[in-house]
């Protein structure tokens, strides 16, 4: 069977840049699934994406499905005919479904009986006939949150469609996709190359588009070119470009023919905190800032044009004129804000609602101030500095700079606090209170910042859970999942001596009578422990290891982490599987017993050598391991407990627990309970698989 290259290109108006990659990847994944479901043999499915097009190129696509033999077994002969030999309704219905009569059916005989059988040779459909529907289905399944409709048609897509190119080798596949008749016409760059041309063969793509249309259709190629050219441009002016992945992706999605240029701005603007300048350059203008080798911002920026100009200086000057007013605004806001102290903004916080039932930002500030001081006392941080940081924590939200450039919240608080002469750890805490903002983000760097960051997040968690508005499904408007994980990360990775129980109780207490959920403390703790499950799974821990620790509901995050590491290490020991099974057996025995057990094992009633030996070792280990548990040395404790494998195995091999002698039975059950309690001091290892 011959093979050909298949090309589909959907020519559109400018696609959403932040969604371009996901649209192209989904298109490729959907179409690959369609090919596989249809049984069409194919080679690589390569996707292309540019601002005004989505395309797929499939190598070595078979020209038709393979022929196949099908068999459909019908009713057993006994049910297929009545006593007179006439076909039953079941047999007739089955035959109709196969497109035959009962008389035309074959018989299938096996050692289990005889059935009606339909056999047929099905000729594979041509690829040409299948492709239009496969393309349409793949496009319909794209993850588009909001569809557009254009003109008088009822067609919906992410953006208006102008061309549809469907080529199998050199042949146009006739189809109407998204309201457009397929053709071999491709549109080039808006201002360079040929605005429109025809493609003779699918193999010519994407080279023909580059040569005649001045469009680089390969997304990764455009991105790599921008990155390399920007790095070279920065090197020429003695700096390093800030090529964040997200901005690099967005810019690559905005241009069809990237041309990297370098521009500058007035050095006087460098007196403004660099974060504000960078915010407007990256966020508003999609420029790449440039830093010197010492990390200081240079008065230059790199941008990407979508055209090769005969006079690039004109484009450079135009971009410099565009960015100057934005930088001047930042300078004005910075100078204006510094005319008063940061704490002078406190009264204005009373005018901004945090949440209708939970009060204003000033109310939140008062709670954060108290909670940050309490946390600082628990972790040995400077209480006065923590309460001061709590008082100032939201003041920068009322400044002109943050009002205009919202992403500078926190960092501007730090700069204004420094200007006011606040302690350095207070200023830094104002910047770091929102950390970690995302997975892998840096944690607060000093104890005061840790106290403030935890206080801010715990106040939100306690408040929102306290009024019954916990996250549901994908909806999490107050980012409670991120807040919970942030608190856990700070406590665990900074090894802070904090207990979620007392921490949550204190956060709830500070709300007074505003909260309506009587179970708020337990709800918050359960929610946070649930975040542990996701965290440790991402870290590579097995689900049963996590469940074994969660079963004990340890509320000290640092302690939880120590238990996780201990159980994970325990699983590598030779004795682990046997002891996990033994714990499960003990758990089942105790669960089925309704006996009232003793507080301690009565050694004088023990008879068998195996139970005497096990009882002695349990007593010895109980005393020996008490300091281990007190110090959180769970790994060492489980290593010691692993030595119980042989006596436990011997006990179950030789000793009957549920004997008729009640005193002996209770004594043996008590010993097993004491054995299990030792393991439960770390985790419920009976849950290990």
Swiss-Prot record:
Reactions accelerated catalytically: tRNA(Gly) + glycine + ATP = glycyl-tRNA(Gly) + AMP + diphosphate
Keyword Cell inner membrane among record annotations: no
Main location (coarse class): cytoplasm
Statement: the UniProt record of this protein carries the keyword Aminoacyl-tRNA synthetase: yes
Stored SUPFAM superfamilies: HD-domain/PDEase-like
Top-level taxon of origin: Bacteria
EC number(s) per entry: 6.1.1.14
Sorted UniProt keywords: Aminoacyl-tRNA synthetase, ATP-binding, Cytoplasm, Ligase, Nucleotide-binding, Protein biosynthesis
Any Gene Ontology biological process: arginyl-tRNA aminoacylation
Molecular function GO terms recorded: arginine-tRNA ligase activity; ATP binding; glycine-tRNA ligase activity
Xref: InterPro entries: DALR_anticod-bd, Gly-tRNA-synth_bsu, Gly-tRNA-synth_heterodimer
Gene Ontology cellular-component annotations: cytosol
Location of the protein in the cell: Cytoplasm
UniProt cross-references to PANTHER family, sorted A to Z: GLYCINE--TRNA LIGASE, CHLOROPLASTIC_MITOCHONDRIAL 2, GLYCYL-TRNA SYNTHETASE
Similarity comment: family membership: Belongs to the class-II aminoacyl-tRNA synthetase family.
Subunit structure, interactors included: Tetramer of two alpha and two beta subunits.
Protein name: Glycine--tRNA ligase beta subunit
Organism: Escherichia fergusonii (strain ATCC 35469 / DSM 13698 / CCUG 18766 / IAM 14443 / JCM 21226 / LMG 7866 / NBRC 102419 / NCTC 12128 / CDC 0568-73)
Upper classification of the organism: Bacteria, Pseudomonadati, Pseudomonadota, Gammaproteobacteria, Enterobacterales
Gene name for this UniProt entry: glyS
């Amino acid at each position: 069977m011959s093979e050909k290259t298949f090309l589909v290109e959907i020519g559109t108006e400018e696609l959403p840049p932040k969604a371009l990659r996901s649209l192209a990847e989904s298109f490729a994944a959907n179409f690959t699934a369609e090919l596989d479901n249809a049984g069409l043999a194919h080679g690589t499915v390569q996707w292309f994406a540019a601002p005004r097009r989505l395309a797929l190129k499939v190598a070595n696509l078979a020209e038709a499905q393979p022929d196949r033999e099908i068999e459909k077994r019908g009713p057993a002969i006994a049910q297929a005919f009545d006593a007179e030999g006439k076909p039953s309704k079941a047999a007739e219905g089955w035959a109709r479904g196969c497109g035959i009569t009962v008389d035309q059916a074959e018989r299938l005989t096996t050692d289990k009986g005889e059935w009606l059988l339909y056999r047929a040779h099905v000729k594979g459909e041509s690829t040409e006939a299948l492709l239009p529907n496969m393309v349409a289905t793949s496009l319909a399944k794209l993850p588009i949150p909001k569809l557009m409709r254009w003109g008088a048609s009822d067609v919906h897509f992410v953006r208006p469609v102008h061309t549809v190119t469907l080529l199998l080798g050199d042949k146009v596949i006739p189809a109407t996709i998204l309201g457009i008749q397929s053709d071999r016409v491709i549109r080039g760059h808006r201002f360079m190359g040929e605005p429109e041309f025809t493609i003779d063969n699918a193999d010519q793509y994407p080279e023909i588009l580059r040569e005649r249309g001045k469009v680089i259709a390969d997304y990764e190629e455009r991105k790599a070119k921008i990155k390399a050219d920007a790095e070279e441009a920065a090197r020429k002016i003695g700096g390093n470009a800030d090529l964040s992945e997200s901005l690099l992706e967005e810019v690559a999605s905005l241009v069809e023919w990237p041309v990297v240029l370098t521009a500058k701005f007035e050095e006087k603007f460098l007196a403004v905190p660099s974060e504000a300048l960078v915010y407007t350059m990256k966020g508003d203008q999609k420029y790449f800032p440039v830093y010197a080798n010492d990390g200081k911002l240079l008065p230059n920026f790199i941008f990407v044009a979508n055209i090769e100009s005969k006079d690039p200086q004109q484009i450079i000057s135009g971009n410099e004129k565009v960015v100057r007013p934005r930088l001047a605004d930042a300078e004005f806001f910075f100078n204006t804000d510094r005319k008063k102290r940061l704490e002078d903004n406190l009264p204005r916080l009373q005018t901004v609602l945090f949440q209708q039932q939970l009060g204003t930002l000033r109310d939140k500030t008062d709670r954060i101030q108290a909670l940050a001081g309490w946390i600082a006392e628990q972790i040995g941080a400077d209480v006065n500095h923590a309460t001061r940081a709590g008082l100032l924590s939201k003041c920068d939200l009322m400044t002109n700079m943050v009002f205009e450039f919202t992403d500078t919240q926190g960092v501007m608080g730090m700069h204004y606090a420094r200007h006011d002469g606040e302690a350095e750890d207070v200023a830094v805490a104002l910047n770091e209170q929102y950390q970690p903002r995302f997975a892998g983000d840096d944690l607060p760097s000093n104890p005061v910042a840790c106290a403030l960051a935890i206080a801010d997040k715990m106040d939100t968690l306690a408040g929102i859970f306290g009024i019954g508005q916990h996250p549901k499904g994908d909806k999490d408007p107050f980012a409670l999942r991120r807040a919970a994980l942030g608190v856990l990360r700070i406590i665990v990775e900074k090894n802070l001596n904090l207990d979620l129980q007392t921490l949550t109780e204190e956060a709830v207490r500070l709300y007074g009578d505003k909260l309506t959920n009587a179970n708020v403390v337990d709800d918050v703790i359960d929610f946070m422990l649930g975040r542990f499950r996701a965290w440790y799974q991402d870290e590579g821990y097995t689900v049963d290891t996590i469940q074994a620790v969660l079963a004990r509901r340890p509320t000290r995050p640092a302690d939880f982490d120590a238990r996780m590491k201990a159980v994970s290490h325990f699983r590598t020991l030779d004795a682990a599987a046997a002891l996990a099974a033994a714990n499960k057996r003990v758990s089942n025995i105790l669960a089925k017993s309704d006996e009232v057990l003793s507080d301690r094992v009565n050694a004088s009633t023990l008879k068998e050598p195996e139970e005497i030996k096990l009882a002695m070792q349990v007593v010895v280990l109980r005393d020996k391991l008490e300091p281990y548990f007190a110090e959180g040395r769970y790994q060492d404790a489980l290593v010691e407990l692993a030595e119980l494998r042989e006596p436990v195995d011997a006990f179950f091999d030789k000793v009957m627990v549920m004997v008729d002698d009640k005193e002996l039975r209770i004594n043996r059950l008590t010993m097993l309970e004491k054995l299990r309690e030792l393991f439960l001091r770390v985790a419920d290892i009976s849950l290990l698989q």
